[in-house]
A protein has these predicted regions:
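Post-HExxH zinc-binding segment in Zn-dependent metallohydrolases
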Residues: 71-99
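Residue-level recognition of conserved beta-strand positions in structured domain cores
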Residues: 18, 43, 68-70
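Well-ordered beta-strand scaffold positions
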Residues: 12-14
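Active-site recognition of the HExxH zinc-binding catalytic motif
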Residues: 57-69
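Catalytic zinc-binding patch centered on the HExxH motif and its immediate surroundings
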Residues: 2-8, 17-40, 49
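Short pre-active-site segment immediately N-terminal to the catalytic Zn-binding motif
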Residues: 38-58, 73-74
């Protein structure tokens, strides 16, 4: 899957970028800020290449945080178990779609 450079949530453009050094130093594969309209993910983590599967999982995970925050659902957004399961289901539904 190609990683988008940006996407829309309501009227906001959410930018997607790579920040391998900072995220590796923080011990995470991704982070996001709805306030800053930004998702950051890793393509390398502590010098090792991150698999495409993990990169896409991370993008979906952070995208769910952004969507929940946009909806004002901050409690759900802080529930990592919910976000992880929902993001995996969303990815599966997208990737298994038939046209």
């Amino acid at each position: 899957m190609k990683i988008p450079k940006s996407f829309k949530v309501f009227a906001s453009t959410i930018n997607v970028g790579f920040d391998n050094v900072r995220l590796s130093n923080e011990g995470v594969l991704g982070d996001c800020s709805f306030t800053d309209n930004q998702i950051n993910i890793c393509s390398e983590y502590k010098g090792e290449k991150v698999s495409e599967c993990s990169t896409v999982d991370t993008l979906y995970h952070e995208k769910v945080h952004i969507i929940l925050d946009a909806m004002g659902e901050h409690k759900l957004s802080s529930n990592e178990k919910f976000v992880e399961v929902f993001s995996r289901l969303l990815r599966q539904s997208d990737e298994s779609s038939k046209f």
